[in-house]
From Swiss-Prot:
Name this polypeptide is given: Aldo-keto reductase family 1 member A1
Naturally occurring in which organism (per UniProt): Rattus norvegicus (Rat)
Catalytic reaction list: a primary alcohol + NADP(+) = an aldehyde + NADPH + H(+); L-gulonate + NADP(+) = aldehydo-D-glucuronate + NADPH + H(+); L-gulono-1,4-lactone + NADP(+) = D-glucurono-3,6-lactone + NADPH + H(+); allyl alcohol + NADP(+) = acrolein + NADPH + H(+)
Tissue expression summary: Widely expressed.
Primary site of residence: cytoplasm
Residues that bind NADP(+): 11-22, 45, 162-163, 211, 213, 215-216, 263-266, 269, 272-273
GO molecular function, one term: L-glucuronate reductase activity
Residue numbers of N6-succinyllysine PTMs: 127, 145
Amino acid sequence: MTASSVLLHTGQKMPLIGLGTWKSEPGQVKAAIKYALSVGYRHIDCASVYGNETEIGEALKESVGAGKAVPREELFVTSKLWNTKHHPEDVEPAVRKTLADLQLEYLDLYLMHWPYAFERGDNPFPKNADGTVKYDSTHYKETWKALEALVAKGLVKALGLSNFSSRQIDDVLSVASVRPAVLQVECHPYLAQNELIAHCQARGLEVTAYSPLGSSDRAWRHPDEPVLLEEPVVLALAEKHGRSPAQILLRWQVQRKVICIPKSITPSRILQNIQVFDFTFSPEEMKQLDALNKNWRYIVPMITVDGKRVPRDAGHPLYPFNDPY
């Protein structure tokens, strides 16, 4: 049985498998959370922009706390600061709104969702007349200093980053008095992120993989993109070990000490996704999966401009995916 959590530099234990909640519809996410907690999940990944934190809060209220199924201190809850709330004055109100929605007194981890800021306000995707996004000039280093105050106030136990490049991580570290503990990025065998993971681990950050199964349910999915869950190497290992393809992909990550947050609302899959600690890959099997890397990124936010689908933020000076890693 391999260890099912990693130790953050804050001393917190972060479970290697958590339940992702992106695209989990209100009306379905509450039951998914309650089921996940009942089968042993102790890590839930949330974000204000997912629009479902209120319902997640209802599930947490029923299942977590004194006299409930799960003591609060056994649960690791992450949420994320959205792009419209990067202005230092907006950071604390944003986390307080998330805490109220989740019905929690503190978060275990709070991430800056993206490095760039959108125009301030309550519209999560402020747009110009031509369909492009309205940005705000707040730099992530200013936002980081405001996030640090949340730790001092006890609202948040640890801070982290999401969708930041290696250069941007170092930029935050250069001003941080509270060091980031986690980087959350897209990661799976087609986008192995080896350089970025090594960069983080050398600096005391753990890495969380989002879309670890390849996110085949995206709205902007392209018909000819490769499907990770149908990859022959993955299917062959699944057959050999008597496991599902998803379990193969998750086992590869946890064996690399990378945290995963697969999203599901289906009980059988929620259960399956956490059953990855009772088998191991040989070094040769790990190499087979490592060899699938092709730096294929599924999650690039797209918008329609003049009738064409284009990457939404690729022209922004803080866009993270123009860097080599």
